[in-house]
Regions:
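Catalytic cores of RNA-modifying enzymes
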Residues: 1-230, 263, 274, 283, ...
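An accessory alpha-helical subdomain
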Residues: 208, 212-214, 220-257, 265-268, ...
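Short, flexible active-site recognition loops that position polar ligands and cofactors
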Residues: 269-275
Length: 291
């Protein structure tokens, strides 16, 4: 069957039988993707080829795993739900290039897994791909970005509201603390919007697939990343307040000191966090540290 014909079959290769044994676990936030158009949009948007090692997060019953295995050099699928492990191994056995690992993506030593597979199979690129549980989307993305992985990109399905905030440009009304964190480490592009009926069971919200291409160097140069991100989080902690007031949540700074730092950074005290671009937050963090 051609890729195009696969895309036209909503349930092809999904592995989902609503009356079968592999029922989604509500406690794990499982909603299985069953829409072939969305599945192949993820595969194509990830730019997977035979020189690619794919790390798949939360493969479930393998709806995305099998198309990835067709296109990639190797797929390492990391699944938390023990019920899925053996059926997925059986389902992907014939591809000969899929390894299924039982583990928590927030706990596994991902860099070691990547290093081992790159060395053993001589692959050139690393793509992380996943349909992320809504309730831990941000922790997963931030772990992947902060760990210093050798991955080239992350392509992830997530709740549309979260995805729209991540994809927003820093310094715009839709931006939030997560916007700056993700854009600091990567460039972000939207692959496809996915409606709720594309899942089993259907969630209460729509989804979006984003691709985050990891930067070789950070978007801005900062002396202290941890403090830089603290400033951003403080700025957005009470996002309707002005920076002069919201930055008081940093602790340890008098209002006069914050005013002086804002002046030194060339930022008006009555501006809100959402109006600052990345460079302005970097200047502000440096000014506060020097205050």
């Amino acid at each position: 069957m051609s890729k195009q014909s696969k895309k036209s079959n909503k349930n092809h290769n999904s592995g989902i039988n609503p009356s079968g044994n592999l029922r989604p676990a509500k406690a794990l936030g499982q909603n299985f993707l069953i829409d072939e158009e969305a599945i192949w949009a993820i595969v194509d948007g990830s730019e997977v080829d035979k020189d690619t090692l794919v790390i798949e997060i939360g493969p479930g019953p393998g709806a995305l795993t099998c198309p990835l295995a067709e296109e990639a050099g190797r797929v390492v699928a990391i699944e938390l739900d023990e019920r899925m492990i053996e059926p997925l191994r059986v389902k992907t056995f014939s591809y000969g290039n899929v390894e299924v690992i039982h583990g928590d993506i927030l706990e596994v030593d991902l860099n070691s897994i990547i290093e081992k597979n790159l060395k053993e199979y001589g692959l050139k690129t690393v793509r992380i791909v996943g349909n992320l549980p809504y309730y831990i989307t941000t922790p997963i993305i931030m772990k992947l970005l902060e760990m210093g992985t050798t991955a080239n990109s992350i392509t992830a399905m997530m709740q549309k509201e979260v995805g729209d905030r991540i994809a927003a440009e820093p310094g715009t009304k839709l931006s939030g603390a997560i916007t700056y964190s993700v854009h600091y480490y990567s460039t972000v592009s939207k692959i496809i919007d996915v409606d709720r009926e594309s899942f089993y069971p259907a969630p209460k919200v729509d989804s979006v697939v984003l691709r985050m291409d990891i930067r070789d160097t950070a978007a801005v140069a900062v002396k202290d990343e941890a403090f830089f991100f603290r400033c951003i989080k403080a700025g957005f902690a009470q996002r309707r307040k002005t920076l002069l007031n919201s930055l008081m949540t940093l602790g340890g700074y008098e209002k006069d000191t914050i005013q002086a730092a804002l002046d030194a950074a060339g930022i008006a005290a009555n501006r809100r966090a959402e109006s600052l671009n990345m460079e302005e937050f970097a200047r502000l963090a440096e000014a506060l540290q020097g205050a």
